[in-house]
């Protein structure tokens, strides 16, 4: 039997760390198909912190792709599980036959599915990538992303799967220590990545609430982002008074980030695709409602779990936000499909499907 190989095809430290830690701590002990990884980027201590995994690192996305293609050609029974897929060479290999459809299983992370960049090289590449995506052996994704993908590729198998957000289930029913009243605190975006469209989001928040709310913008990740942080701060200060705007430019440890989220009353996410599920989960767990773009299909996942959804096109005010908080507080968090530990069983199923051991 050939063991499934997992591929992290792009050097995205935060996401890669989350996946590797999840596999090491949760999946590797029970499945031999959860131990082999090929990773773009440097070790950065992963080998030491993930002793249950066999990790091979490659200095570039191209070097990793070449190694994957060589393995695929050497053994056509070798299957790969691609987590996110931000690697042009791998898509082209699927198009050219270097990797066969039966060897290619893909966990959609959102950004790798949607065609949102206006850069020329992306606009030229998107049609090729779209064709390649129709040739994969199967996909795993959120309900909304499965629906989006199926409209383009109805014949490709799709299975429900959620990114393994780091969560403590014991916090689901945690008593609220903070009385939710007074000035609203609004979280804008889930990171400092430009895909959060921070400036447009700040303008939208101002249009809805004016300079009457506290606005918190976490921008400590990714690194080397100071010019964009300054740009967002300047735009924010043109709208909000200094005491109402908090731009966080330092990377935060998980517990500190969790504490920050729990001080908020609302999450505001303007991007028109699925992303930031981890932050959404942590907000929902704390009974903090989220405002989504109606083009972000994750609203389908939330509605399926009977969670209140607010949209950027809604008329928002404190009364609407407090009512959404009340509705969230009445939900039994232990039954939410995309919460830990409920997302575990779909991962076990996904491993068996990608490895060819399940129909």
Curated annotation (Swiss-Prot):
Keyword Flavoprotein: no
InterPro entries for this protein: WecF (IPR009993)
UniProt keyword annotations, A-Z: Cell inner membrane, Cell membrane, Glycosyltransferase, Membrane, Transferase
UniProt topology in membrane: Peripheral membrane protein
Subcellular location: Cell inner membrane
Signal sequence extent: none
Any GO BP annotation: enterobacterial common antigen biosynthetic process
EC number(s) reported in the record: 2.4.1.325
GO MF terms held by the record: 4-acetamido-4,6-dideoxy-D-galactose transferase activity; fucosyltransferase activity
Protein name: TDP-N-acetylfucosamine:lipid II N-acetylfucosaminyltransferase
Reactions performed catalytically: beta-D-ManNAcA-(1->4)-alpha-D-GlcNAc-di-trans,octa-cis-undecaprenyl diphosphate + dTDP-4-acetamido-4,6-dideoxy-alpha-D-galactose = alpha-D-FucNAc4-(1->4)-beta-D-ManNAcA-(1->4)-D-GlcNAc-undecaprenyl diphosphate + dTDP + H(+)
Species assigned in the record: Salmonella typhimurium (strain LT2 / SGSC1412 / ATCC 700720)
This protein's encoding gene: wecF
Function per UniProt: Catalyzes the synthesis of Und-PP-GlcNAc-ManNAcA-Fuc4NAc (Lipid III), the third lipid-linked intermediate involved in ECA synthesis.
